[in-house]
Amino acid sequence: RWGEVANIKGEHIIGGKVIFMETKNGSRRVIPIAKALESLIKVKATGRLMNPSYAIVRSAIRTVRPDLPVGQSVHVLRHTFATHFMINGGNIITLQRILGHSTIQQTMTYAHFAPDYLQDAVRFNPVAELSRFCP
């Protein structure tokens, strides 16, 4: 989420992880990042790491994908990440935690581009077996 990224500080990036302190749903969230990415984005040890100008980020994204709806530039990156995460064999529960969703249903809307993986989530669901014991 743009608001979360805009507030990242150097002290929030520790050992290959980003700690989001101020999230949309109010809970702290930790996500893993590659060491190479950490060295690129952690340009200082403390304080804000970037100019939180949405217009600058939107402009950069628009040069790559100019047909995005207004207000959706950064948001589409979340969908793209979710899609590729699932296509690469990611776990829907892990994706839910990374995206900071409170329900799995929210996460499933993000992963709608990878229906085969969602079917696996249903097929391998151990709770589904419990339904045979319920009338």
Question: Where on the chain are the PLM-derived regions?
Answer:
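Conserved beta-strand positions that form and line the central face of beta-propeller blades
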Residues: 17-19, 48-49, 73-76, 106-109
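Active-site/catalytic core of tyrosine-dependent DNA strand-transfer enzymes
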Residues: 34-70, 75, 81
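C-terminal secondary-structure termini that scaffold catalytic or DNA-interacting sites
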Residues: 125-135
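Residue-level marker of structural boundaries
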Residues: 14, 46, 66, 91, ...
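Hydrophobic recognition helices of helix-based DNA-binding modules
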Residues: 41-44, 85, 89, 118-121
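Catalytic-site neighborhood detector that most strongly recognizes the C-terminal catalytic loop/helix
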Residues: 22-26, 34, 99, 103-124
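Conserved tyrosine-mediated DNA breakage-rejoining catalytic core shared by Y-recombinases
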Residues: 1-41
